[in-house]
Amino acid sequence: GPNPGFSPFR
């Protein structure tokens, strides 16, 4: 993703 730690699949 664009940000480290951002997960669209949670």
Curated annotation (Swiss-Prot):
It is found in: Secreted. GO terms for molecular function: toxin activity. Has been extracted from the spider web. Negative results: does not target bradykinin receptor B1 (BDKRB1). The keyword Membrane does not apply. Keywords: Amidation, G-protein coupled receptor impairing toxin, Secreted, Toxin. GO terms for cellular component: extracellular region. This is Nephilakinin-1. Causes constriction on isolated rat ileum preparations and relaxation on rat duodenum muscle preparations at amounts higher than bradykinin. Is a partial agonist bradykinin receptor B2 (BDKRB2). Is moderately lethal to honeybees. May be related to the predation of insects by the spider webs. Belongs to the bradykinin-related peptide family. It comes from Trichonephila clavipes. The keyword Secreted applies. The modification Arginine amide is found at R10.
